Amino acid sequence: MLARAKNDNEETAVGESIDLVRLNFNPQAQLGLNIVLALVMFGIALDLRVADFKVALRTPKALAIGLVSHHLLFPAFTFALVMLVRPAPSIGLGMLLVASCPAGHISNFFTHRARGKTELSVSISTLSMLASIVMTPLNVGFWAAQDAQMGALLRSFSLDPLHMLGDIAMLLGVPLAAGMLIAARLPAFAKKAHGPMRVFSLLVLVGFVVGALALNWAVFREYARFVVFVVLIHNALALAGGYGFARAAGLVERDRRSVAFETGIQNSGLGLVLVFNFFDGLGGMAIVTAWWGIWHIVAGMILSTYWMRRPPLPARAAVAGQA
């Protein structure tokens, strides 16, 4: 009994020590990550047109459900999960940061693969990016302040929400606007450049995430047991919660699948940039964000493969079945 209590105390001490860990990521690599993320956004924007948003606005309910699920429900569910699991404060902050990031555009690929509504997915992703300029610092600050430990840790960094807002605007808003402008003015060039640019930038971004883990492998190996399972549950909650909310709202199956991926696939690249720009590479936050960036691809492939083999019913048939 005493031995077990001693082991539990040691486990708790090791788990809490992650709040003191700072990951190794030099300023040059940090600048490179910022540039790569901007290139990812620019590459995505080369394939966006104002007409794409007009198409999405024909189904405003589905668009609104997707944005509410992503920016309001998921952060709230994340806070509830943190309160239930009670991880180390830096891990909890990492979970909140991931939940507050915009949707990752690989969600569009998973939606298409899962036979969801791709145009809805693209619209939610893009509007989510724009909304995140305000919603990311707002959600992180609001939900962290609801817990004394996370709030104290957040205050220790003297975080300026306006500074974070400005950085997100530069990393997302400027490349997005530049890409859409080039797409409108030079459509032939944008069409040729979009594919190679998107593939190249995404591969480099994944390389940065993997590289960050490799450089800090000893730290990850020591603390992985505190993060891996939590990220799995967190991601599953996001995917299931997005789908369940869309179903409860009365959306058709294709739209439900889109909302599921738009809620459960996050822009972890932006999250990693923010961890190093504003939180000094805080161990728990960085490990959660980096591991999420790997795991949500695995989970997205599994779920999209499952749905790919189960074509959604046509809208009329689905309504008839519910009746």
Where are these regions (language model features)?
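Alpha-helical transmembrane segments of multi-pass small-molecule/ion transporters
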Residues: 4, 10-323
